[in-house]
Amino acid sequence: MSIEVDWRAATSGPDGEALAERIRSFIHDKFQQVALPRFIRSVQVHSFDFGTIPPDLEVKDICEPFADFYEEDEDDETSDVSEELVSGHGTQWHRDLNEPPFHEEMAMNRPLRDPFDEAFHSSTLRSPMEHLNPHFLPRAGTPGIPGGTSTLGYHLMSLGGLSGTQTPLAAVAGGTPFANGWTDPGMGASSRGHPSISGPTAVHPSRMEADIDTSNPTSRPSTSSTLPSHPSASNQPSGDATTGKEHGSLAEDEHLDDPMTSGHPLRLPPRMRERRPEDFQVLCHAKYAGDVRLSLTAEILLDYPMPSFVGLPLKLNVTGITFDGVAVIAYIRKRVHFCFLSAEDADALIGSDQQEARGQDDRPWSSADPTASPKRQGGLLREIRVESEIGRKEDGKQVLKNVGKVERFVLAQVRRTFEEEMVFPSFWTFLI
């Protein structure tokens, strides 16, 4: 189902002008936070305009909103007055932490166990916190600009360096067991009461980053590598059996830090709003090749006759972009949440364009055909058209050699800001 958007009514008037000004201010603030190259002194964003060409929207699915949209923001003062919170989750969390058996077990000094004890490895006891819903546990962070820096909405932390079917969104759509937050000690965990990598105290962040293979984009932290590994008793020399056990005990003691006494206390889960029957979410395939405009000025430093001798303003005008992606619009009470999906998540939820076209033609997809890949290729922003103005030109080229570098830097920052602030799990929230 296709939707015709009245682009002029949505982007004009006082509300449209106010929204354009907030977008301009947001992009300007982002440029003030990034590290500029040596040959650029400053970047100023002067204006933003939505243009006159509307996007082409095709509704793919209407479903329930993502659970991330129900997380309560601590800075939102109006939510406490106008909305009801799910009271059972937070009180149940505190009640479980304050129960005497759980508190005494976490606080007392437990004796070290023999790492080679067969009965210990075959134990079926599980963590007291296993009954908690895994989606209440915070996700691992990843380096970069977090999604919560936007002044236009309420953003979430970015995914923990995972992509493709390893992301929680794609894992839910593909049926992969990503959200199983707790591991049975009999199935490979090292001690009772310590969760797997998705738990809040499972592993130190520096160890988590070390476990990620950056050379493989589909890799994710291994659960086995986050817990102490012990060599089998048969591999130890007979004379060093005692030494091997002592070494295993020390290694186990290093990872069995008591969360009640260590410097990393258990973090409370985010408060969740109550789901209502009238909440809904729309997935749209958005295509845009319009004339959105963005005006910037970058000051170029000249190093002749001395370093940073003078600065020349370079005016850059973004005259249009080409976009192809999947948009998410969720309506929850008096809030509208808006974001885009990454290519991997879009493929997992609604499939690719090639799969849809071949499904309509009843033609099977062959993996031997490299030109018919079912994956979405490239980023969401396919093209950014830009014009620069500075000094005179010779044969259609700029006289200053750094103009091209400035253009590439500015466009890279625009693309990076869009992908980090507009792609799920980051999203914008509008109060209506």
Curated annotation (Swiss-Prot):
It is a peripheral membrane protein. GO terms for molecular function: lipid binding. Pfam families: MMM1 (PF10296). Residues 182-273, 354-377 are annotated as: Disordered. One of its GO terms (biological process) is protein insertion into mitochondrial outer membrane. Its main location: mitochondrion. Component of the ERMES/MDM complex, which serves as a molecular tether to connect the endoplasmic reticulum (ER) and mitochondria. Components of this complex are involved in the control of mitochondrial shape and protein biogenesis, and function in nonvesicular lipid trafficking between the ER and mitochondria. Mdm12 is required for the interaction of the ER-resident membrane protein mmm1 and the outer mitochondrial membrane-resident beta-barrel protein mdm10. Component of the ER-mitochondria encounter structure (ERMES) or MDM complex, composed of mmm1, mdm10, mdm12 and mdm34. A mmm1 homodimer associates with one molecule of mdm12 on each side in a pairwise head-to-tail manner, and the SMP-LTD domains of mmm1 and mdm12 generate a continuous hydrophobic tunnel for phospholipid trafficking. Belongs to the MDM12 family. This is Mitochondrial distribution and morphology protein 12. It comes from Aspergillus oryzae (strain ATCC 42149 / RIB 40). The gene is mdm12.
